[in-house]
Amino acid sequence: IPAAPVAAQARKLLRDLAFRPPLLAARSQVVQLTPRRWLNLQEYQSKKLMSDNGVKVQRFFVADTANEALEAAKRLNAKEIVLKAQILAGGRGKGVFSSGLKGGVHLTKDPEVVGQLAKQMIGYNLATKQTPKEGVKVNKVMVAEALDISRETYLAILMDRSCNGPVLVGSPQGGVDIEEVAASNPELIFKEQIDIIEGIKDSQAQRMAENLGFLGPLQNQAADQIKKLYNLFLKIDATQVEVNPFGETPEGQVVCFDAKINFDDNAEFRQKDIFAMDDKSENEPIENEAAKYDLKYIGLDGNIACFVNGAGLAMATCDIIFLNGGKPANFLDLGGGVKESQVYQAFKLLTADPKVEAILVNIFGGIVNCAIIANGITKACRELELKVPLVVRLEGTNVHEAQNILTNSGLPITSAVDLEDAAKKAVASVTKK
């Protein structure tokens, strides 16, 4: 199996596609909290989902005070305890708290130490390589039984469009970055395509368990866990269930030690209980505000605001701004069923950002009615007293009516004939300042 495709399937296939290479430089300086473009759950929530569906995980409790953490550690009555700060960002183990405590993951055999550490975690910000400099506030900790791992493997279930369905991806080398394994030892990556109608076959689960290196009774146990993980994957409308490590203990137990679950946002209507667990406290406030009006907002570090319909067009708009020497301040996707009120709210969000020095509207009207966009723009400009340059490029449904609305508005709106023209004018409007 070629290394690159496997690596992509293992970790990147279902990542948000909002950023192409030209945007990576800006992406590293995104002005937001923990980057999220899909529903993610905290570690303890994912483990509870797995446990409730028969998947073997370590025993744990969740605490939101130091006293609760201490009592949880006592109730576990374990030989060793692991205390984990619960935030959505990675790199917790090497993070630093605003309290001065180093590390968001700690091992101890003493319940009293758990209480002492929790005092320095809960209510304080934890900064990691994936958080803003100031870090993210920790509201909860997970107090879990620390199990010895005699062997670590990797297992993931992905919804792979190229295979028209779910795919099992596994490797006997777990506990490490799967991309590294795929690049250095591609022969250690194994893949099983699953017919979504027939479901996972016993033979597929057994073969994957064997490829992961489980032997004897452990092989049957691993195969059973794989099938339960697949059933969970379908039941909760996941797009990815990644277990790393998927390991075995010296006592002969197959355990899912850590898991990441991504969900299909389109399934929210039938997964209400799961989506109700979404922790929005780590989002940028403006992103939460945008979601109230069905707007998809991603903050970037530039000064040209982008107001676009459709993720693909938004990517192209950000790219062409870069190519013309500018930097996008955001990625704002209006979507399909547009109302004037949405346009107004979008402008309200954009103009509230002090970084924004110009706004570029780029709309291709298929389902979207350009006239509605134009009316929303003129209303927003008047009521919000727009003070930054506005460049508008419209194409598609009712575009001539829309252009007349803008032209006759008497507002200082710069029209553009195409995307290239729009980007050049937006960049030029900022450069003049």
From Swiss-Prot:
- Keyword Mitochondrion in annotation: yes
Checking PROSITE patterns in the record gives: SUCCINYL_COA_LIG_3
Q: Quote the subcellular location field of this record.
A: Mitochondrion
The UniProt entry lists the main location of this chain as mitochondrion
Q: Where does Mg(2+) bind?
A: N244, D258
Here the disulfide bonds are none
Question: What pathway, per the record?
Answer: Carbohydrate metabolism; tricarboxylic acid cycle; succinate from succinyl-CoA (ligase route): step 1/1
- What InterPro entries is this protein classified in? ATP-grasp_succ-CoA_synth-type, ATP_grasp_subdomain_1, Succ-CoA_synthase_bsu_CS, SUCC_ACL_C, Succ_CoA_betaG_euk, Succ_CoA_ligase-like_bsu, Succinyl-CoA_synth-like
Q: Where, in this chain's numbering, is substrate bound? A: N309, G366, I367, V368
Residues modified as N6-acetyllysine are K74, K133, K140, K201, K228, K272, K292, K348, K387, K424
Which cofactors, if any, are listed as required?
Mg(2+)
Top-tier EC class: ligase
Phosphoserine PTM sites in chain numbering? S162
GO molecular function terms listed in the Swiss-Prot or TrEMBL record: ATP binding; GTP binding; metal ion binding; succinate-CoA ligase (GDP-forming) activity
Q: Which residues form a coiled coil?
A: none
Catalytic reactions on record: GTP + succinate + CoA = succinyl-CoA + GDP + phosphate
- Hey, where's the site called Important for substrate specificity on this chain? E80, D148
Subunit annotation: Heterodimer of an alpha and a beta subunit. The beta subunit determines specificity for GTP.
The record, for HAMAP family, names:
Succ_CoA_beta (MF_00558), Succ_CoA_betaG_euk (MF_03221)
Q: Which family does it belong to?
A: Belongs to the succinate/malate CoA ligase beta subunit family. GTP-specific subunit beta subfamily.
Protein name in UniProt? Succinate--CoA ligase [GDP-forming] subunit beta, mitochondrial
Origin species, per record, is Sus scrofa
Q: Gene name, please?
A: SUCLG2
